[in-house]
Amino acid sequence: MAEQINESHQRFLQVLMSHGIMESSLVRALHRHCCEVHKVNYMHDNLDDFVGVLNKHLQPLFMKIEKGVGEEDGLTYYALVNRVENDITKMASDYAENELELFRKTMELIIISENGFAPPISILNLADELQSKKMKKKEVEQLLQSFVQDKWLIGRNGEYTLHTRCIMELEHYILNTYQDVAKICNVCHKIAIQCQLCENCGIPLHLQCAGIYFRGIANPLCPNCKESWPHEIPDLSQVSSQGPSHSQAAPVRGRNQRSRNISTVARTSR
């Protein structure tokens, strides 16, 4: 029989859900806070067990708290992921049909791009290609801000890429839908959106994976074809010292169906 969840688990889950995704240091602090507030025995190395108890109760709802690595900062993140819906219909409670269609097209632009980014002008032009209700340019601009706020996209230097949360939640959809063009990192074997490509054989490496793999090597060679690696090796110390961006830390808009599911977990576990 699964261990019962208590008020500390419920508070932890509600906060994680309100943020959508949280960096691991914040999750560890949240774990401690929840245990202390509800006077539950706290052990700093017990986070995995704490999350494991929650995941056992989330399993019947086809939801899970998972860990992933941010492509931009290499930090570990925790997110509440819906495992039964393998496409972007999981976003349907927050967006209209034409908005979801625009997101699909935007995601495709990002995935097929060489650097993992889509310029805003290309996304704005998608408004004229929608099969459902057309959108005005101003509406597209406002929608992009909503995608950023809800942590599906990240805006960086005027362009857009997929948020860590989006990659974690839509991993299966991306692999199934874009299996011929989706890039898989040669080192960690995870989806690679922002990456470096070998100019000879075309294999991709996450920026973080490239930094780790080539660390201390004066003349880096492609791990696949052994040709000279043509790119500047990322400085991991500079990236990691930046910490998570504000968009990674801010809460997202509420999700009604997911909120009801969480309430069900809390009630049935008492």
Curated annotation (Swiss-Prot):
It is an enzyme of class 2 (transferase). CDD domains: RING-CH-C4HC3_NSE1. InterPro entries: C1-like_sf, Nse1, Nse1_RING_C4HC3-type, WH-like_DNA-bd_sf, Znf_RING/FYVE/PHD. Keywords: Chromosome, DNA damage, DNA recombination, DNA repair, Metal-binding, Nucleus, Telomere, Transferase, Ubl conjugation pathway, Zinc, Zinc-finger. A zinc finger (RING-type) spans 185-226. One of its GO terms (cellular component) is chromosome, telomeric region. Residues 236-270 are annotated as: Disordered. Residues 237-248, 259-270 have a biased composition (Polar residues). It catalyses: S-ubiquitinyl-[E2 ubiquitin-conjugating enzyme]-L-cysteine + [acceptor protein]-L-lysine = [E2 ubiquitin-conjugating enzyme]-L-cysteine + N(6)-ubiquitinyl-[acceptor protein]-L-lysine. One of its GO terms (molecular function) is ubiquitin protein ligase activity. Gene3D superfamilies: 3.90.1150.220, Winged helix-like DNA-binding domain superfamily/Winged helix DNA-binding domain, Zinc/RING finger domain, C3HC4 (zinc finger). Component of the SMC5-SMC6 complex. This is Non-structural maintenance of chromosomes element 1 homolog. It comes from Xenopus tropicalis. The gene is nsmce1.
